[in-house]
Protein backbone atom coordinates (compact mmCIF):
# COMPACT_ATOMS: atom_id res chain seq x y z
CA UNK A 1 0.00 0.00 0.00
CA UNK A 2 2.91 2.32 0.73
CA UNK A 3 4.33 1.76 -2.73
CA UNK A 4 0.95 2.26 -4.40
CA UNK A 5 0.42 5.50 -2.46
CA UNK A 6 3.87 6.72 -3.49
CA UNK A 7 3.27 5.88 -7.13
CA UNK A 8 -0.20 7.44 -7.14
CA UNK A 9 0.95 10.78 -5.78
CA UNK A 10 3.48 11.20 -8.59
CA UNK A 11 1.22 9.82 -11.34
CA UNK A 12 -1.75 11.98 -10.39
CA UNK A 13 0.44 15.06 -10.02
CA UNK A 14 1.61 14.42 -13.59
CA UNK A 15 -2.01 13.99 -14.70
CA UNK A 16 -2.89 17.29 -13.04
CA UNK A 17 0.00 18.98 -14.81
CA UNK A 18 -1.35 17.79 -18.19
CA UNK A 19 -4.88 19.11 -17.62
CA UNK A 20 -5.94 22.26 -19.38
CA UNK A 21 -9.35 22.38 -17.67
CA UNK A 22 -9.06 24.42 -14.46
CA UNK A 23 -11.35 22.34 -12.23
CA UNK A 24 -10.12 19.02 -13.61
CA UNK A 25 -6.58 20.09 -12.72
CA UNK A 26 -7.74 20.63 -9.15
CA UNK A 27 -9.55 17.28 -9.14
CA UNK A 28 -6.42 15.34 -10.11
CA UNK A 29 -4.56 17.31 -7.46
CA UNK A 30 -7.06 16.03 -4.91
CA UNK A 31 -6.42 12.43 -5.93
CA UNK A 32 -2.70 13.04 -5.58
CA UNK A 33 -3.16 14.44 -2.08
CA UNK A 34 -5.41 11.55 -1.09
CA UNK A 35 -2.50 9.28 -1.91
CA UNK A 36 -0.36 11.29 0.57
CA UNK A 37 -3.00 10.41 3.15
CA UNK A 38 -3.02 6.76 2.08
CA UNK A 39 0.78 6.58 2.23
CA UNK A 40 0.89 8.10 5.71
CA UNK A 41 -1.85 5.81 7.02
CA UNK A 42 -0.04 2.78 5.57
CA UNK A 43 3.03 3.60 7.67
CA UNK A 44 0.95 2.42 10.66
CA UNK A 45 2.57 4.41 13.44
CA UNK A 46 0.81 6.79 15.79
CA UNK A 47 2.76 9.72 14.37
CA UNK A 48 1.97 8.71 10.78
CA UNK A 49 -1.74 8.20 11.46
CA UNK A 50 -1.91 11.61 13.14
CA UNK A 51 -0.11 13.14 10.15
CA UNK A 52 -2.52 11.39 7.80
CA UNK A 53 -5.55 12.78 9.65
CA UNK A 54 -4.00 16.25 9.82
CA UNK A 55 -3.36 16.25 6.07
CA UNK A 56 -6.94 15.13 5.47
CA UNK A 57 -8.25 18.15 7.36
CA UNK A 58 -5.72 20.62 5.94
CA UNK A 59 -6.20 19.47 2.38
CA UNK A 60 -9.99 19.59 2.71
CA UNK A 61 -9.97 23.21 3.87
CA UNK A 62 -7.42 24.38 1.32
CA UNK A 63 -8.99 22.51 -1.59
CA UNK A 64 -12.39 24.00 -0.76
CA UNK A 65 -10.83 27.44 -1.15
CA UNK A 66 -9.24 26.43 -4.46
CA UNK A 67 -12.49 24.98 -5.83
CA UNK A 68 -14.50 28.00 -4.64
CA UNK A 69 -12.14 30.31 -6.51
CA UNK A 70 -12.33 28.09 -9.61
CA UNK A 71 -16.12 28.19 -9.36
CA UNK A 72 -16.07 31.98 -9.08
CA UNK A 73 -13.89 32.18 -12.19
CA UNK A 74 -16.23 29.87 -14.08
CA UNK A 75 -19.39 31.65 -12.93
CA UNK A 76 -18.30 35.29 -13.02
CA UNK A 77 -15.72 35.28 -15.84
CA UNK A 78 -16.98 32.32 -17.89
CA UNK A 79 -13.47 30.84 -18.14
CA UNK A 80 -12.95 27.06 -17.82
CA UNK A 81 -9.48 26.43 -19.19
CA UNK A 82 -6.10 27.42 -17.80
CA UNK A 83 -4.96 29.28 -20.96
CA UNK A 84 -8.09 31.46 -20.69
CA UNK A 85 -6.97 32.76 -17.28
CA UNK A 86 -4.31 34.99 -18.84
CA UNK A 87 -4.44 38.37 -17.05
CA UNK A 88 -7.72 37.62 -15.29
CA UNK A 89 -6.39 38.68 -11.87
CA UNK A 90 -6.67 42.28 -13.06
CA UNK A 91 -10.46 41.85 -13.05
CA UNK A 92 -10.73 39.45 -10.09
CA UNK A 93 -7.90 40.36 -7.67
CA UNK A 94 -9.54 39.07 -4.48
CA UNK A 95 -10.43 35.76 -6.11
CA UNK A 96 -6.91 35.21 -7.39
CA UNK A 97 -5.35 36.37 -4.12
CA UNK A 98 -7.36 33.61 -2.44
CA UNK A 99 -6.27 31.13 -5.11
CA UNK A 100 -2.64 32.16 -4.60
CA UNK A 101 -2.94 31.42 -0.87
CA UNK A 102 -4.49 28.04 -1.70
CA UNK A 103 -1.66 27.33 -4.18
CA UNK A 104 0.97 28.13 -1.54
CA UNK A 105 -0.73 25.86 0.99
CA UNK A 106 -1.23 22.99 -1.47
CA UNK A 107 2.39 23.22 -2.56
CA UNK A 108 3.56 23.04 1.05
CA UNK A 109 5.34 26.38 1.30
CA UNK A 110 6.16 27.43 4.89
CA UNK A 111 4.38 28.84 6.94
CA UNK A 112 1.16 27.66 5.27
CA UNK A 113 -0.77 24.77 6.78
CA UNK A 114 0.02 22.45 3.86
CA UNK A 115 3.68 22.60 4.85
CA UNK A 116 2.90 21.47 8.39
CA UNK A 117 0.90 18.42 7.35
CA UNK A 118 3.41 17.39 4.68
CA UNK A 119 6.24 17.89 7.15
CA UNK A 120 4.63 15.52 9.64
CA UNK A 121 4.10 12.90 6.92
CA UNK A 122 7.74 13.21 5.86
CA UNK A 123 8.94 13.00 9.48
CA UNK A 124 6.87 9.87 10.06
CA UNK A 125 8.39 8.23 6.97
CA UNK A 126 11.96 9.14 7.92
CA UNK A 127 11.49 8.04 11.55
CA UNK A 128 10.43 4.55 10.46
CA UNK A 129 13.58 4.07 8.39
CA UNK A 130 14.09 1.42 5.76
CA UNK A 131 14.07 1.87 2.03
CA UNK A 132 10.33 1.78 1.33
CA UNK A 133 9.34 4.74 3.55
CA UNK A 134 12.26 6.68 2.09
CA UNK A 135 11.03 5.93 -1.44
CA UNK A 136 7.66 7.29 -0.32
CA UNK A 137 9.36 10.36 1.14
CA UNK A 138 11.12 10.97 -2.19
CA UNK A 139 7.80 10.54 -4.01
CA UNK A 140 6.22 13.15 -1.73
CA UNK A 141 9.02 15.59 -2.57
CA UNK A 142 8.64 15.02 -6.31
CA UNK A 143 4.88 15.39 -6.03
CA UNK A 144 5.26 18.65 -4.08
CA UNK A 145 7.51 20.03 -6.83
CA UNK A 146 4.99 19.01 -9.49
CA UNK A 147 2.26 20.64 -7.40
CA UNK A 148 4.25 23.87 -7.40
CA UNK A 149 4.49 23.71 -11.19
CA UNK A 150 0.82 23.12 -11.94
CA UNK A 151 -0.55 25.46 -9.26
CA UNK A 152 1.80 28.35 -9.91
CA UNK A 153 1.27 28.00 -13.64
CA UNK A 154 -2.27 29.23 -12.95
CA UNK A 155 -1.11 31.92 -10.51
CA UNK A 156 1.51 33.30 -12.88
CA UNK A 157 -0.85 33.23 -15.86
CA UNK A 158 -3.50 35.16 -13.95
CA UNK A 159 -1.24 37.75 -12.30
CA UNK A 160 1.53 38.12 -14.88
CA UNK A 161 0.23 37.49 -18.40
CA UNK A 162 2.95 36.74 -20.94
CA UNK A 163 0.97 38.17 -23.79
CA UNK A 164 -1.41 41.06 -23.87
CA UNK A 165 -4.51 39.51 -22.40
CA UNK A 166 -7.53 39.80 -24.66
CA UNK A 167 -9.81 42.60 -23.65
CA UNK A 168 -12.67 41.41 -21.51
CA UNK A 169 -15.93 43.24 -22.17
CA UNK A 170 -16.86 45.60 -19.35
CA UNK A 171 -18.80 43.80 -16.64
CA UNK A 172 -18.31 40.29 -18.03
CA UNK A 173 -15.63 39.39 -15.46
CA UNK A 174 -15.98 40.66 -11.91
CA UNK A 175 -15.55 39.59 -8.32
CA UNK A 176 -18.16 37.45 -6.65
CA UNK A 177 -20.55 39.29 -4.37
CA UNK A 178 -19.92 39.16 -0.64
CA UNK A 179 -23.37 37.91 0.26
State what each model feature region is.
Residues 1-5:
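Extracellular interaction modules
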Residues 6-175:
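Hydrophobic transmembrane alpha-helices and their helix-loop junctions in integral membrane proteins
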Amino acid sequence: VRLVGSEMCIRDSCMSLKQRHFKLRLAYSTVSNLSYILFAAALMTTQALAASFLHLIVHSVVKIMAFFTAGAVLHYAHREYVPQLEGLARYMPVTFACFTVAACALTGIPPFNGFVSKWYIARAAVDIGGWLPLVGFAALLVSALLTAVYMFQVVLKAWFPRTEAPAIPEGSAHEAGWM
